[in-house]
Amino acid sequence: MNRRVVVPTLLVCAAPWLGGCQATDAIVDYFGPHADPTLTSLAHDASADAHALQKLDPDAASLRAQHADELYSEIERLCGRDEEGHVPRSCEVNREGEAHEATDAAAVLAAASSSTKEQLDAVSPESRPLLVAQAIAMEARSTDEPGAVPELTEDDADLATELLDWEYQQVYALDFARSYVTPDVEELVDERLALHENRVLALQEAVAKIGPVPQPAAAYTSSSGELPVDADSARAFLDYVAHSDTVTWTSAASQEVPDQAAPNAEWRSWLISVAAQSHRISAA
């Protein structure tokens, strides 16, 4: 984290080699905290995207404007504030991004998501969840589905196994709910079941390459404490299951592996893609 202590005015004025307090700003600018360059670059890109997308896709423009605001706020949070609540002069940034033209909103968001993911390891760990959330939000607007699970390392084994167990639970929950839904909802449940079963197969195949594959339990309980008992509760349960899936995969994509020599960028990118898929389902 790029924090430094701002030199107190009293000490600056007392220094014999300075020509009075007029040098304070220059000293603070030099010794004070500075904006994270990666966050600044991403914020400028988001601002430029928002401007370029205004007429092409107002919703996408709004999303990128939100991202810019979040990134500038993160820059200020990392820099800290003085006793009067102001960000140090040394941390002030120009909020004007370099303008560019856009003809395809999906391409703009895809490029922005890719750039965001590439910069994840260039920012401090405490800023990564924000970048992950932004990448997920952009990919959630796409219709692209996650590809095959990339090759896992031993460091990824625990999380992959946990997610496989989670997918077992999702399949059980949806299968249970299907017994109570009305006929017009059965197709929706079947679509979601197929999606989660595909995730199960993909994770089983990936986990099998690095260790034993855990098998599903005979039954699972709901973390909400309640399972469906009729059509109304089944419909509400489906919403709960979709929301829980979004939370779980978003958390997984943001998770840091302790003592990992080098992050598995492809695995993290896949987790972001699955989280985005879950967001699309939950919003549908």
Each predicted region: which residue ranges?
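C-terminal motif of bacterial Sec signal peptides marking the signal peptidase cleavage site
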Residues: 17-20
